[in-house]
Every structure is written in structure tokens, then in C-alpha cells.
């Protein structure tokens, strides 16, 4: 499971500790990092952590057949791939 910092505590109630996986953005030791979760806080929650800022990632898509050809995907084609990514 890769829960956000807002959903992690309620999500853990139904999981055994050995299966829990936590995904949150971690910061360095100490300091004031508004909106971030510290390493010390992460260690208290679970055994596994996905580090980084995946909530801030933007995914762009262009079909292989369209690259450098001047052809573009239709809105329906783009929506189909968007659905698969989600």
C-alpha cells in the first residue's frame, strides 16, 4: 500500500504491521520543513518507505508513432492512455 500522509494512519488500522508499506515525502534531519514529513516521523509509522515527491510528478504522454511525425493523438486516444496510467 502506498498511502499519502493524510490517509496513512486510518489505512493502517486494517493491516498487519508486517505488510504495511508507507509512501510519503521525507526531509532531512531536523529543521522546519512546512508540509513535509520528517525521517523521524516516518520511522515511527512503518517498515518501508517510498522516498521522493511522487505527489508532485506530472506525466506527459505522446504516442511513439507521433514523435517527430507531425501526427497527434486524438482526445479519445489520450484519454484512453490517461485511464491506463491512473
Swiss-Prot record:
The active site is at residue 62. It comes from the Eukaryota. Keywords: Allergen, Gluconeogenesis, Glycolysis, Isomerase. One of its GO terms (cellular component) is cytosol. It catalyses: D-glyceraldehyde 3-phosphate = dihydroxyacetone phosphate. GO terms for biological process: gluconeogenesis; glyceraldehyde-3-phosphate biosynthetic process; glycerol catabolic process; glycolytic process. GO terms for molecular function: triose-phosphate isomerase activity. It holds the Pfam family TIM. Pathway: Carbohydrate biosynthesis; gluconeogenesis; Carbohydrate degradation; glycolysis; D-glyceraldehyde 3-phosphate from glycerone phosphate: step 1/1. Its EC number is 5.3.1.1. Belongs to the triosephosphate isomerase family. Homodimer. This is Triosephosphate isomerase.
